[in-house]
C-alpha cells in the first residue's frame, strides 16, 4: 500500500510539473526577414522588409517557423490568442480571378486529421469570412475598394473562455471598418499544435494582378492560469 501511494504521489508530481509547461507564445515582426519564417511558393520578403504574397495562377504562403500550442492535452486547457498585422492589398484587374489574403492556422503535419481555420479577406466575393476547411462559418460583406492600396489594420482574437473568434479590419486613413465574429471551439477543429501565418491564391488572367503586402505582424497566445488547487484537482482526476 505504501509503495502504491508513493508511486501515485510521484506520478502526480510529474504531471503537475508538466501542467505548468503549457507553452505561451509571443513574437513581433516590426519588419520582416526570412529568419523565423517558412516561405512557400512565390512568397518573398522585399528590400523594404515587407512580406509579399504576390502570385499568379498559384498559391503561396508564409508561416511562423515554430509551432504554436493551442491545447494542453494533459489538462485540456486551451490557449487564447491575439494577433495584429498591417496589410496592403492593391488590385489591378479586368476579371475576377484574384481572391485576397488569408490568415491561417494549419496542421503542423501535412497528413494530420486536424482542420485548417482561416480568416479570409476575399477580394473576389467581396467578403471577410471565418472558414474551417474552406467552409464558411460566418462572413460579412466588405468593399475592398475602401482599402485598395491602403495600409489596413487587422486584429484577430480568440477567447478560450467565451469560445469567440473575432476579427476587426480598419483603415486609419478613411475611418472605414468591418467586423465579424463567430463562436468556435478551436480545440475541436485544430490539432494541439499548429502553424500560424498567411496564404494567398490567384487564378490566371492576362490583365489580373494583385499585390499583397504584410508590413508588420505580432502574435501572442496565453493559457489561462489555473490556481495550484485547480491544477491539483485536474491532475488527481486524471490519475485516480
Curated annotation (Swiss-Prot):
Glycans are attached at residues 33, 84, 88. One of its GO terms (molecular function) is carbohydrate binding. InterPro entries: ConA-like_dom_sf, L-lectin, Lectin_LegA_CS, Lectin_legB_Mn/Ca_BS, Legume_lectin_dom, Leguminous_Lectin. It comes from the Eukaryota. SUPFAM superfamilies: Concanavalin A-like lectins/glucanases (SSF49899). The keyword Glycoprotein applies. Belongs to the leguminous lectin family. Lectin and alpha-amylase inhibitor. Acts as a defensive protein against insects. Heterodimer of chain 1 and chain 2. This is Alpha-amylase inhibitor 2. It comes from Phaseolus vulgaris (Kidney bean).
Amino acid at each position: 500500500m505504501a509503495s502504491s501511494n508513493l508511486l501515485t504521489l510521484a506520478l502526480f508530481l510529474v504531471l503537475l510539473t508538466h501542467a505548468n509547461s503549457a507553452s505561451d507564445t509571443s513574437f513581433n515582426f516590426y519588419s520582416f526577414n526570412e529568419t523565423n519564417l517558412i516561405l512557400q511558393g512565390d512568397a518573398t520578403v522585399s528590400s523594404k522588409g515587407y512580406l509579399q504574397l504576390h502570385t499568379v495562377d498559384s498559391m503561396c504562403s508564409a508561416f511562423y517557423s515554430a509551432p504554436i500550442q493551442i491545447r494542453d492535452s494533459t489538462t485540456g486547457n486551451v490557449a487564447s490568442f491575439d494577433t495584429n498585422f498591417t496589410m496592403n492589398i492593391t488590385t489591378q484587374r479586368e476579371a475576377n480571378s484574384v481572391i485576397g489574403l488569408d490568415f491561417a492556422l494549419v496542421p503542423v503535419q501535412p497528413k494530420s486529421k486536424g482542420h485548417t481555420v482561416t480568416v479570409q479577406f476575399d477580394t473576389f466575393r467581396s467578403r471577410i469570412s471565418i472558414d474551417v476547411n474552406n467552409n464558411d462559418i460566418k462572413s460579412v460583406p466588405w468593399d475592398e475598394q475602401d482599402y485598395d492600396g491602403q495600409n489596413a489594420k487587422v486584429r484577430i482574437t480568440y477567447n478560450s473562455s467565451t469560445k469567440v473568434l473575432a476579427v476587426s479590419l480598419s483603415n486609419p486613413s478613411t475611418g472605414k471598418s468591418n467586423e465579424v465574429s463567430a463562436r468556435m471551439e478551436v480545440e475541436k477543429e485544430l490539432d494541439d499544435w499548429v502553424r500560424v501565418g498567411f496564404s494567398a491564391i490567384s487564378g490566371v488572367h492576362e490583365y489580373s494582378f494583385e499585390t499583397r503586402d504584410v508590413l508588420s505582424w505580432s502574435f501572442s497566445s496565453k493559457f489561462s492560469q489555473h490556481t495550484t488547487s485547480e491544477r491539483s484537482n485536474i491532475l488527481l482526476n486524471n490519475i485516480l
